[in-house]
Swiss-Prot record:
UniProt note on tissues of expression: Expressed in respiratory epithelial cells (at protein level).
PROSITE patterns in alphabetical order: ARM_REPEAT (PS50176)
UniProt name for this protein: Outer dynein arm-docking complex subunit 2
Entry-linked SUPFAM superfamilies: ARM repeat, Hypothetical protein c14orf129, hspc210
Length: 1044
């Protein structure tokens, strides 16, 4: 079960968060098999069904408490099973919406209760419990991988003293059998998968276009692509959708229906969400079933299309049959034999996993995602695209057209590597992690003479003696090895294998010559990949132990070049390279002293520099960062940071900058007093060093103590002065980022105001890249929390560019700009400008943004806008559908969105007409539904919203009817004074209704309110006293009525 879920299920990308299962046929098939297994478990294995899990399986369920009947204790918001463990804890506990289940028996019953919603529940459970084996049987059973067999599990459990070991053994075996079943089932499913190619889709569309137009004799009214641009692989979908297998999107107008927006993908054809009204972009979400091709889809959707196709006798079968034949061909005998040989010695599960990967390679190797655009519009006079080139300054790579000339051995090797990479740890790496497709020189290409000369030298390397080898290496270095032609000439004739073999000889001169060449050519991304494929990295890691300092330096520099992608970084770590590289940093014992004439000391410094360079490349992996820390890298880096050698400082600070994203490192950086040296190096003349120091400060300044250290060591002034140089955008982004994070502290903001940094930041609001704008706006958002700075921003003309940025699409930028605009809106003069520029409408439109952070930030920004606008009530009503939109946001699952919307509703409800409108839109039941929350921020603003909404019609009574009063009384037990004040005011308003007074009294409100009457907060005093007065008045009236 664990292996199948980890290897076969297809997940969406989720940034730094957890992904969700994609809605694909394979995922649905896996979930259905799991449901069948769990449903039948209670009948087939009644004894094992009672076994209590080590940890409960938890997820958010869509089931309501009312769905549970006999066998459960049901209340309004909770459900407990009558079945309990030996400690009396229920085996099923539901507290809407979270559910916790601790036995297979309760899982089986839940699926029976879910009925038609069982697939949704299974999906939610799998998404929330990525490693169910550990939760069911404990962390000791996390070793149940592909190579686990029955004897392994049996041996493990029989060594355990747990009296339930026999049941655990049976469950472990059952889960293992389920895992094997899922792998076999998926193998069959994958082998039958549809795999359309861009060429097939294009031919179908072109043929349909020929028979489209007005009139009854055509099959369609029209068919057209949504995009005129075509990539070099034949796809028209954007690259981030090509990764999901999507080829293109077409708009089809049949004779007998509305226009359909259709997605054509490698997995088939389906209806998507259509074009959006606002931007005209495609809503990529699938809205129906997947069909094997476009014609089958249209036959199903349009009877007229099917009828006219039959009349015209159009046949798509010939081309499609060819495609099917190519797809359906069994792997060639040589490939099958190689596959068997490759996996010999492994068990049955490994064989099946390799077969799955092999079939996937067979189905997808005809086309791969591409970033190279080509247009179908005829632009005359334009040259053809250049061949792949690497930008030496930025290291960015323009991806070439995929090669189809891969050898069979390479195909099998890559398949095995993909399995290994899936099992290995993943890391959140922002650098170039893509391995470039292989790219061979074409035989017919016009190659320069150097290409052939280098190939001759490689032959001497292969067959010559030691002297000839050294001469050949020296001669090869005379060529311009920075040119791609020379690099690929060495590779194409087998020179890389020879150079790597030379590293295993005992001749130091041969090793040095080989490493010098490898260091130069490993700047090429393809060469880097080839070096890893040929096993060159472990050999270089071993050379780091050499007593020869020149060898150490060259090996470390070459590792630094090669470790630019994830697989290479993993290989370095797995062969002990991180520990050895950290040890190189200890060579520079005297690095803190001025450079001396001693060659020995200069070499020590160079060894440390090369080690730092390699660690910089390796530190882009989360696991490697932790390995560097455990190997004692931080104290050594801190010592090297005091050096006067500028070329040493850049890789040292670069490594610290990468590692500072980890909390453990930030604490260690403070402990080692590194901030002081980072600040000192901000005054360096070297722009790259300044950039990395600023970036390291940006990463560390999340912590208040670090922000104070930057100020105390005089770091704010150089940061402010660096804002004036805007030519170097990378440095400007780092500097503005550091200023943003430092501005979180008010003391730092005061200093920035002294240094005139706020005026400079306002000047950077235009004509800058988004990376800079995000940081500039973030810094202004923090600075504008103070009145003096808001005035500066307004007087410098900063309001208009801020409002202009509200129409962007960058999520981080929108979050920051809404915060900045909201901060400025506190000042009435600034609010007038925002209103005149239509800023409030733009903020309101951001409530439709799909990102919760943007929605929340926009809602917070609306609060001061509504509060300080001249005619706020009329302004809000002028937004068509605006009030309904904000009320509907109360259905969100995000706590920050809910809190911000409640705050906005509090301000909106100050106008009676608006309060009447939102009441009609159902604000009362939605607010009441949120009352059972433990989040103090949400409680505060929710109570304020309820208090304000009570002032219309019979809303007070309605809140009581929707059970909002009792949860509000519990808020008085909170330790937050803001919650107390808002709650007391809400209860005072609600106590105007007699039924609510009774509910408050029954829930112990009087005692809690009496304590608050003595509060130093006057508003809290008055509200608490008023509420007690109303309750007392009702009690007296009741008493009087009883005796009369």
């Amino acid at each position: 079960m664990g292996v199948a879920l980890r290897k076969l299920t297809q997940w969406t990308a989720a940034g730094h968060g957890t992904g969700i299962l994609e809605i694909t046929p394979l995922n649905e098939a896996i979930l259905k098999e799991i449901i069948v297994f769990v449903e039948s478990f209670i009948y087939k294995h009644p004894q094992e069904a009672k076994f209590v899990f080590v940890e409960p399986l938890e997820w958010n369920t869509s089931l309501a408490p009312s769905a549970f009947e006999s066998g459960y204790v049901v209340s309004e918001t909770t459900v407990k099973s009558e079945e309990v463990d030996k400690n009396g804890q229920p085996l099923l506990f539901l507290s809407v919406p979270q559910i916790k289940i601790r036995s297979f028996g309760q899982l089986s019953r839940l699926l029976l209760i879910a009925k038609t919603g069982k697939l949704k529940e299974a999906q939610a459970c799998v998404e929330a419990n990525r490693d169910p084996i550990v939760k069911i049987l404990g962390s000791d059973y996390n070793t149940m991988k592909e190579n686990s067999i029955a004897l392994n599990i049996l041996g493990k459990i029989t060594r355990d003293d747990d009296p339930e070991s026999e049941i655990k053994m049976k469950i472990a075996m059952l889960l293992k059998q389920l895992d094997l079943h899922l792998l076999n089932h998926s193998l069959k499913h994958i082998s039958l998968e549809i795999s359309l190619s861009p060429m097939t889709v294009k031919k179908d569309i072109e043929l349909l276009k020929r028979f489209s137009g007005k009139g009854n004799q055509t099959v369609l009214e029209s068919i057209e692509y949504t995009s005129d641009y075509e990539f070099s692989n034949g796809c028209r979908a954007p690259p981030w959708r090509q990764i999901r297998g999507e080829i293109c999107y077409v708009l089809v107008k049949p004779h007998d229906g509305e226009t359909l927006c259709i997605t054509c993908s490698a997995g088939g054809v389906f209806l998507n969400g259509g074009k959006t009204d606002d931007e005209g972009d495609v809503n990529y979400e699938r809205k129906g079933s997947i069909y094997k091709n476009l014609v089958t889809f249209l036959r199903e959707k349009s009877p007229k299309f099917s009828e006219n196709m039959s009349k015209l006798g159009i046949s798509f079968s010939e081309d499609q049959q060819k495609e099917k034949d190519q797809l359906g061909k069994a792997p060639k005998k040589e490939e099958a034999a190689a596959l068997r040989k490759d996996i010999s010695g492994s068990d049955k599960r490994s064989l099946e996993k390799n077969q799955i990967n092999f079939w996937r390679n067979q189905m997808t190797k005809r086309w791969e995602p591409s970033l190279n655009w080509k247009t179908t519009v005829n632009y005359k006079g334009k040259g053809s695209a250049k061949e792949i080139q690497e930008d030496k300054h930025t290291g960015k790579l323009e991806k070439p057209r995929p090669s189809v000339s891969h050898g069979r051995a390479q195909l099998l090797r890559k398949s095995a590597e993909k399995i290994e990479e899936t099992v290995s740890d993943s890391s959140s790496e922002s650098e170039e992690d893509e391995e470039p497709p292989d790219h061979r020189q074409e035989a017919s290409a016009d190659l320069p003479s150097e290409y052939w000369q280098i190939q001759k030298l490689v032959k001497y390397l292969k067959g010559g003696n030691q002297t000839a080898t050294v001469i050949a290496l020296c001669s090869m270095r005379d060529f311009s090895l920075a040119q791609e032609t020379c690099q690929l000439a060495i590779r194409d004739v087998g020179g890389l294998e020879v150079l790597i073999n030379l590293l295993e000889t005992d001749e130091v001169k041969c090793k040095i010559g080989s490493l010098k060449i490898l260091k130069e050519i490993s700047h090429n991304p393809q060469i880097r990949q080839n070096i890893v494929d040929l096993g060159g990295l472990p050999i270089m890691v071993n050379i780091l132990d050499s007593p020869h300092k020149s060898l150490k330096c060259l090996a470390a520099e070459t590792i630094a070049n090669v470790a630019k992608f994830k697989r290479a970084r993993r290989v370095v770590r797995q062969h002990g390279g991180i520990t050895k590289l950290v040890a190189l940093l200890d060579c520079a014992h005297d690095s803190t002293k001025p450079a001396q004439s001693s060659l020995y000391e200069a070499r020590d410094v160079e060894v440390a520099r090369c080690g730092a360079l390699a660690l910089w490349s390796c530190s882009k992996s989360h696991t490697n960062k932790e390995a560097i820390r455990k190997a004692g890298g931080i104290p050594l880096l801190a010592r090297l940071l005091k050096t006067s050698h500028e070329n040493m400082l850049i890789p040292v600070v670069g490594t610290l900058q990468e590692c500072a994203s980890e909390e453990n490192y930030r604490a260690a950086i403070k402990a080692e007093r590194i901030i002081e040296n980072l600040v000192k190096n901000l005054n360096s003349e070297n722009e790259q060093l300044q950039e990395h120091c600023a970036m390291a400060i940006y990463q560390c300044a999340e912590d208040k103590e670090t922000r104070d250290l930057v100020r105390l060591h005089g770091g704010l002034k150089p940061l402010a002065s660096l804002l004036n140089n805007t030519d170097n955008k990378e440095r400007l982004a780092a500097v503005t980022g550091a200023i943003w994070k430092c501005s979180i502290s008010k003391e730092n903001v005061t200093k920035f105001r002294e240094y005139k940094a706020i005026e400079t930041l306002v000047g950077l609001l235009t004509d800058q890249p988004e990376e800079v704008l995000v940081n500039v706006v973030g810094a202004l958002g923090e600075c504008c929390q103070e009145r003096e700075n808001r005035v500066i921003v307004r007087k410098c003309g900063g309001i208009q560019p801020l409002v202009n940025l509200l129409v962007g699409i960058n999520q981080a930028l929108l979050v920051n700009v809404t915060k900045a605009v909201g901060a400025c809106a506190v000042e009435p003069e600034s609010m007038m400008i925002i209103d005149r520029l239509d800023g409030v409408r733009l903020l309101w439109s951001l409530l439709k943004n799909p990102h919760p952070d943007v929605k929340a930030s926009a809602a917070w920004a609306l609060c001061p806008c509504i509060k300080n606008a001249k005619d706020a009530g009329e302004m809000v009503r002028s937004f068509v559908g605006g009030l309904e939109l904000i009320v509907n946001l109360l259905k969100s699952d995000n706590k920050e969105v809910l809190a911000s919307v409640c705050a906005a509703i509090t301000n909106i409800a100050k106008d009676q007409e608006n309060l009447a409108v939102i009441t009609d839109h159902g604000v009362v039941p939605l607010l009441s539904k949120l009352a059972n929350t433990n989040n103090n921020k949400l409680r505060h603003h929710l109570a304020e919203a309820i208090s304000r909404c009570c002032m219309w019609g019979r809303n007070r009574v309605a809140f009581g009817e929707h059970k909002a009063v009792a949860p509000l009384v519990r808020y008085l037990k909170s330790n937050d004074t803001n919650v107390h004040r808002a709650t007391a005011q809400a209860l005072y308003q609600l106590s105007e209704d007699a039924d609510n007074c009774i509910t408050m009294h029954e829930n112990g409100a009087v005692k809690l309110l009496l304590d608050m009457v003595g509060s130093p907060d006057q508003d809290l005093q008055e509200a608490a006293a008023g509420c007690i007065s109303n309750i007392r008045r009702l009690a007296l009236a009741t008493e009087k009525a009883r005796y009369t």
